[in-house]
């Protein structure tokens, strides 16, 4: 998922299994919290263009509005599109994302929801290179060359929805409940390469 839908990334150090549950690989330390964007008190309309070599152009539209007599309803929209050739030869990448953040805030309660869909497609992408047994580390290859052939590709789609509610029980105590779902679909034809001799064959 493209990061434009997030307001900030929080890195929480230390054990967090009691609060966030155990990760799939069983580690108990730390967590990364992705905070999605919300509409601010002032209207926001921001259009950002981007360019990356060799010829990848893109745009990002960020809109935020609040409605209601007390500005209690908020809408935040983020749309992203990038497409073109990368700095590596025979490599291209295309990214798109639409994300919608909705919220309602009252005197002592708040409700928010997020919906998003993102796609990530590319050709000729490099997945790393390992050394076969007995092969010494060679000099570094040219940084502008992809090890994978141009027909190697991946095509991924992410979809998700999140819902959260908060209630201020007292001035010092807040109760909350949150739920979410996500689905990732990935089609790929590529793999890591292995260097088999000093001549550079893999």
Regions found by a protein language model. Give the residues of each.
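Short intrinsically disordered, low-complexity coil segments enriched in acidic
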Residues: 1-4, 17, 32, 152-153, ...
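Outer membrane beta-barrel
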Residues: 1-8, 107-113
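A beta-strand signature from Gram-negative outer-membrane beta-barrel systems
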Residues: 3-48, 71, 88
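Flexible, surface-exposed loop regions and adjacent strand-edge segments
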Residues: 26, 92-98, 128-138, 191-201
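Short loop/turn segments at secondary-structure transitions that flank enzyme active sites
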Residues: 38-40, 119, 183
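Transmembrane beta-barrel wall of Gram-negative outer-membrane proteins
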Residues: 44, 51-129, 138-142, 149-180
């Amino acid at each position: 998922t493209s990061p434009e839908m997030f307001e900030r990334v929080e890195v929480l150090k230390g054990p967090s299994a009691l609060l966030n549950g155990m990760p799939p690989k069983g580690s108990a330390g730390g967590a990364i919290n992705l905070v999605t964007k919300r509409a601010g008190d002032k209207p926001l309309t921001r259009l950002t263009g981007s360019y990356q070599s060799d010829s990848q152009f893109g745009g990002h539209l960020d809109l935020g509005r609040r409605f209601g007599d007390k500005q209690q309803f908020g809408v935040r929209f983020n749309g992203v599109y990038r497409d073109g050739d990368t700095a590596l030869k025979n490599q291209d990448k295309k990214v798109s994302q639409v994300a919608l953040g909705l919220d309602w805030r009252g005197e002592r309660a708040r409700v928010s929801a997020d919906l998003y869909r993102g796609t990530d497609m590319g050709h000729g992408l490099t997945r790393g290179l390992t050394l076969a047994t007995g092969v010494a580390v060679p000099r570094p290859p040219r940084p502008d060359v992809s090890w994978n052939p141009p027909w190697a590709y991946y095509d991924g789609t992410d979809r998700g929805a999140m819902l959260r509610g908060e209630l201020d029980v007292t001035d010092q105590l807040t109760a909350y409940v949150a739920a979410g779902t996500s689905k990732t679909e990935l089609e790929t034809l590529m793999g890591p390469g292995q260097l088999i001799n000093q001549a550079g064959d893999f």
